[in-house]
Amino acid sequence: MFPQKITLWLYPLGLFANLFFGTAFCVQWFLIKKRGCSFVPKIFWHLSCSGAVLMICHGFIQSQYPIALLHSFNLIIYFRNLNIASSTPLPISKIVSLLVVSATAITLSFAIGTQYLPHMTWMASPNILHLNLPEANFLWQLIGCIGLTIFSLRFFIQWFYLEYKNQSSLPTPFWKASLVGGSICLIYFLRTGDIVNVLCYGCGLFPSLANLRIASREAIQKPFSCSCFISAGEHSGDTLGGNLLKEIHAKYPDIHCFGVGGPQMRAQNFCTLFSMEKFQISGFWEVLLALPKLWYRRRILYKTILKRNPQAVICIDFPDFHFLLIKKLRSLGYKGKIVHYVCPSIWAWRPSRKTTLEKYLDLLLLILPFEQKLFKDSPLRTVYIGHPLSETIKLFCPKQNWKERLHLPTDKPFVAAFPGSRHSDILRNLTIQVQAFQASDFASTHHLLVSSANPAYDHLILEILQQNRCLHSNIVPSQFRYELMRECDCALAKCGTIVLETALNLTPTIVTCQLRPLDTFLAKYIFNIILPAYSLPNIILGRTIFPEFIGGKKDFRYEDVAAALNILKTSQAQEKQKNACKDVYQAINESASTIKECLPFIFEASY
């Protein structure tokens, strides 16, 4: 429109316009800090109107049609925010008419100007620093238009809230559009060398980020809902979660519980966001491959928690995943109580996790007696509740005629096998358990009954039994595992919670855990996990009551397991293990609180 010298001389007009916008946002920011909540004063709209008028002029002077057009729209929306609070607000139809007239006037002005004025174009790229930049092609101009459109769209979002929600405010979608549009505009103006707009849009990102952070914190400060998030990622955690839900529903029937759980938790009217089975991964390589899915599920979980704002978050075992979730919740301002049920194995490896527990948790529930000493001088509130399995097994009433119901042979006694619940566990552990049974003295006198924790893997169990020609064998569903433990002469069990269950059922047991070569290497040489014992009964008593065979293929052979199994052929050896199992039960229940006694601290504000 103007000769180049005049255009360059008037170029700072855009800077003055943005000073008005910057001042408006500074005033709004100051009042937010002062009042402690989102607020948009009238002066914000007055300053914005002044800035918009200058930016429309700037758009004409610099031959930038999108800037002139979009700021003319914004000017009308600023006016509407002032007008709607007046005694004579205009009808919305007149505001729409003003937008149409404005768009028509700006477009016709540029159409005539580009036709008859030699210095005028639709979208110029001022380069007042005379940088050696090539002309922006159509693609870059399209990117610039998209950025400016998104950036200006924020006030149409604000207008929607104004008209239909009767809120003269700057909602969260406004700031999101500001952030996205402003970022695209910044990239475009960096490309074109437009230094004023680089400064303006670059600085303009800070109010967007700051207000989005405030909006996030305000969402957390809303009243807690009458709900509780509970997460269990493993079968043992599902058992603990099922017992916990029984106690919660009995004492606080109005509390809605949701989260991640398995069949036992779902049986307690538990609303699952993800089933526990989606988190069942073991071994370094499997975890590595599953990281994207785990990361996605973690994101869904923390967003849901922040949206629902439950009174408490209770994470059961599964520490590596749960620690990431807990840290994210605290970083985003979650103020509810966070409880971790089951202490991570800090006594075995990574003792630094104790600091993480103390920093993020309100309560840690301990289930093993020796863990109390670890937190003797800790500021973290801990409660030793004993292992819930001891009470479950104490109250357990065996099902009558369970063998007949499952059509199991009754002509011989039997040995039980508990290979684990995951596909990889069954593949490695059941193979060596079956081979050990076949090589032992029990093979000629006993049946082998294999406990199946997951019916989906029954076909795998059958394949392994057939491959090893174990003819005298059957599969027993996991719901009959306690009957199986109590009536078998002895058991082969994969290292884990199941070993504690066999101990509490007074079942003579041999512990096996065959690892992948990579897992063996990591455990021995990277994480330095070298302990005198690995199964819970042995750790609790501080002595070996169950023989352990843990490691890679080179660490032990099935013949070694068979030799240990043969020792249990005698009644004296079986009685010795059973007496030691009674000591385990006594150690677990000594000076233990109950989960019921912990619930008031979690759900009642007075605690």
Curated annotation (Swiss-Prot):
HAMAP family: LpxB. Pathway: Bacterial outer membrane biogenesis; LPS lipid A biosynthesis. It holds the Pfam family LpxB. The keyword Lipid biosynthesis applies. It is an enzyme of class 2 (transferase). Condensation of UDP-2,3-diacylglucosamine and 2,3-diacylglucosamine-1-phosphate to form lipid A disaccharide, a precursor of lipid A, a phosphorylated glycolipid that anchors the lipopolysaccharide to the outer membrane of the cell. It catalyses: a lipid X + a UDP-2-N,3-O-bis[(3R)-3-hydroxyacyl]-alpha-D-glucosamine = a lipid A disaccharide + UDP + H(+). Residues 1-224 are annotated as: Unknown. One of its GO terms (cellular component) is membrane. Its EC number is 2.4.1.182. NCBIfam families: lpxB, PRK01021.1. PANTHER family: LIPID-A-DISACCHARIDE SYNTHASE, LIPID-A-DISACCHARIDE SYNTHASE, MITOCHONDRIAL-RELATED. The gene is lpxB. GO terms for biological process: lipid A biosynthetic process. This is Lipid-A-disaccharide synthase. GO terms for molecular function: lipid-A-disaccharide synthase activity; phospholipid binding. Residues 225-607 are annotated as: Lipid-A-disaccharide synthase. Keywords: Glycosyltransferase, Lipid A biosynthesis, Lipid biosynthesis, Lipid metabolism, Transferase. In the C-terminal section; belongs to the LpxB family.
